[in-house]
Curated annotation (Swiss-Prot):
Keywords, sorted A to Z: Disulfide bond, Pheromone, Secreted, Signal
Cystines in this chain: 40-55, 47-72, 52-63
SUPFAM superfamilies: Protozoan pheromone proteins
Phylogenetic classification of the source organism: Eukaryota, Sar, Alveolata, Ciliophora, Intramacronucleata
Tagged with keyword Magnesium: no
UniProt cross-references to InterPro entries, sorted A to Z: Pheromone_Er2/Er23_protoz (IPR016057), Pheromone_protoz (IPR009064), Pheromone_protoz_sf (IPR036245)
Protein name listed in UniProt: Mating pheromone Er-2/Er-9
Quaternary data: Homodimer.
Signal peptide: 1-19
Location(s), subcellular: Secreted
GO CC annotation: extracellular region
GO molecular function: mating pheromone activity
Described function: Mating ciliate pheromones (or gamones) are diffusible extracellular communication signals that distinguish different intraspecific classes of cells commonly referred to as 'mating types'. They prepare the latter for conjugation by changing their cell surface properties.
Residues cleaved off as propeptide: 20-35
């Protein structure tokens, strides 16, 4: 294999690991938010406060699920 193919494989493995870690974190935060529900307004304020970047558009519901995480769900 040439070097470019090896680098591409390494990049795919790293990307997969990060995606799995983010998915696990989002799932655990969704479970936590189900135990301690927030109103939409509280979630939006918390999301804006922590600057998680998921406050706009179709990912707003994701923000509601991750606002209990101090890192706001980012890797």
């Amino acid at each position: 294999m040439n070097k470019l193919a090896i680098l591409a494989i390494i990049a795919m493995v790293l990307f997969s690991a990060n995606a799995f870690r983010l998915q696990s974190r989002l799932r655990s935060n969704m479970e936590a938010s189900a135990r301690d529900p927030m109103t939409c307004e509280q979630a939006m304020a918390s999301c804006e406060h922590t600057m998680c970047g998921y406050c706009q558009g179709p990912l707003y519901m994701t923000c509601i699920g991750i606002t209990t995480d101090p890192e706001c769900g980012l890797p």
